[in-house]
């Protein structure tokens, strides 16, 4: 290209020349930069303050625009520093997803037991993210500065339909899919907009299947001394589902077609830390094929990520109809919306279907019983 020789020389100077040369280039780069990227926490660091002073000196200037993404996951303190650095602030987030991560349920319970009710109520208020407070306040005071995006491009429409009802209040026409039907179902895996997976397991998955609920009706259990939950029936079901996927016609072809490591990974998500620990143990011990790339985590830590294939372990199942963490629609929304091509949810279908939010999601899925699947993969 026109500038290839200059760029190549610049790269050589940066990597080969002495320290003084590299520092010279860095100073020249800083003085001409027009875009600075940083996390919220880095914005308060000495490193970024030095860059700020280099750009603006001691003048009380500010960045023309500060754009803050994933703002619903930021605490008020994390949001405050970047917000004072800009003449114009654009805050982007989704208050239908999870707020800043903290184990507030355990903290609140402990404080109430210690008769610290006022402090417990204060911490409970953090369940509503600062982004949601700003969004709702701005909408009341000056609606013109608030905009709502209504179109998603991540997932196949059939997966989107499992979460669309979470946005029905804000979006008059509901959540829209920005992918054309002919693009979504394009059998060329890497074609623009393709969400085709091509997997076939007769009686379980076809290429046109994108959202499945696998019914497992075993009850949860609580490890001694823990506030978390495990469901051993679902642990067995995860192993069965993965074996089924590996045996599926088209699975290896699909995996070979994916170039990025993260696109080959199967995401395994659960709502509970104890279940996450057990799944990690299974993978480490080889009970889940270690040659299969997997990304395993709790739903809170999966926010912001996506994978082609997602398996979710819901965990909760009891006679008392207690859903715990799993009842939070933000947690459901984040979990289900991580999948691009195939979503498989494992859980007690009858138990969760009694919850109105889950019922709407489940009704948009194909249904299969784990016993049927176990028979297929023998």
Identify the meaning behind each predicted range.
Residues 1-64:
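Conserved helicase NTPase catalytic core signature
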Residues 41-43, 51-378:
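Conserved helicase motor core of SF1/SF2 NTP-dependent helicases
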């Amino acid at each position: 290209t026109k500038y290839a020789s200059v760029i190549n020389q610049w790269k050589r100077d940066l990597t080969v020349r002495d320290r003084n040369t590299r520092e010279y280039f860095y100073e020249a780069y800083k003085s001409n930069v027009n875009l600075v990227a940083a996390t919220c926490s880095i914005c308060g660091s000495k490193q970024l303050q030095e860059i700020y002073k280099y750009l603006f000196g001691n003048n009380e200037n500010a960045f023309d625009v500060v754009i803050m993404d994933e703002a619903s996951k930021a605490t008020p303190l994390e949001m405050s520093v970047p917000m004072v650095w800009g003449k114009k602030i654009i805050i982007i987030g989704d208050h239908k997803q999870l707020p800043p991560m903290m184990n507030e349920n355990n903290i609140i319970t402990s404080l109430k037991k210690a008769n610290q009710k006022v402090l417990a109520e204060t911490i409970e208020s953090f369940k509503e993210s600062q982004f949601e407070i700003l969004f709702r306040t701005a909408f009341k005071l000056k609606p013109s500065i608030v905009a709502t995006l209504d179109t998603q491009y991540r997932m196949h429409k059939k997966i989107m339909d499992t979460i669309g009802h979470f946005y029905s209040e804000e979006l008059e026409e509901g959540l829209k899919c920005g992918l054309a039907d002919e693009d979504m179902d394009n059998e060329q895996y890497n074609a623009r907009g393709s969400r085709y997976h091509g997997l076939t397991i007769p009686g379980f998955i076809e290429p046109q299947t994108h959202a499945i609920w696998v019914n497992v009706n075993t009850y949860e259990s609580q490890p001694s001394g823990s506030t978390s939950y495990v469901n051993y029936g679902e642990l067995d079901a995860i192993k069965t589902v993965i074996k089924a996927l590996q045996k599926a016609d088209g699975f290896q072809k699909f995996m070979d077609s994916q170039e990025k490591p993260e696109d080959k990974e199967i995401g395994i998500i659960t709502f509970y830390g104890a279940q996450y620990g057990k799944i990690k143990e299974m993978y480490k011990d080889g009970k889940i094929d270690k040659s299969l790339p997997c990304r395993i985590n709790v739903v809170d830590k999966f926010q912001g990520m996506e994978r082609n294939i997602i398996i979710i372990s819901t965990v909760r199942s009891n006679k008392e109809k207690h859903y715990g963490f799993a009842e939070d629609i933000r947690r459901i929304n984040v979990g289900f919306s991580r999948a691009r091509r195939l979503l498989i949810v494992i859980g007690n279908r009858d138990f969760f279907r009694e919850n109105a939010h889950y019922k709407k999601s489940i009704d948009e899925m194909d249904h299969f019983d784990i016993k049927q699947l176990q028979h297929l993969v023998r």
